[in-house]
Amino acid sequence: MKPIDFLAIGDVVVDAFIRLHQASVHCNINNSNCEICMPFAEKIPYEFVEEIAGVGNGPNAAVSAARLGLRSAMMTNVGSDENANKCISAFKKDGISTKHITRHKGFKTNYHYVLWYEDERTILVKHEAFKYKFVPPWRNPKWVYITSLGA
């Protein structure tokens, strides 16, 4: 087995991009501190929803490294749900090793709702309270990318 060139360590999520059809943006006088506003207690139409599995800072870096031709691996923690399977499948499709992924029975994989309006996005986040465990590589990788965990 060849050593890993690039190891990414960080949380993985499934993003559900919700393309909003109707909303408004209100900013202060300096055009900063903007807020997205929608009717309260109403049914709000949206254009579409698209789920993307296996994303986040670490996964995005691992995919980039793999596409550059490096032997890439992801070290992360996931739940025991279907979203974990989707993330692992996405990694394998991109040629990323999944040998360093820890599954937690009874937990869900991190899932974010991304409210996408015009050219901006607002992300609703919920991170699972994993008791993080990591499977170290049997050889030191050439490069390690460490990013957010549980944040």
Residue ranges, per PLM feature:
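Glycine-rich phosphate/adenosyl-contacting loop at the front of the ribokinase-like
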Residues: 1-75
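A glycine-rich helix N-cap at a beta->alpha junction
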Residues: 90-107
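Alpha-helical transmembrane segments within multi-pass membrane transporters and channels
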Residues: 77-79
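Short, glycine/charged-enriched secondary-structure capping and boundary segments
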Residues: 21-24, 88-90, 128-129
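Conserved phosphate-binding/catalytic loop of the ribokinase/pfkB sugar-kinase fold
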Residues: 99-104, 112-151
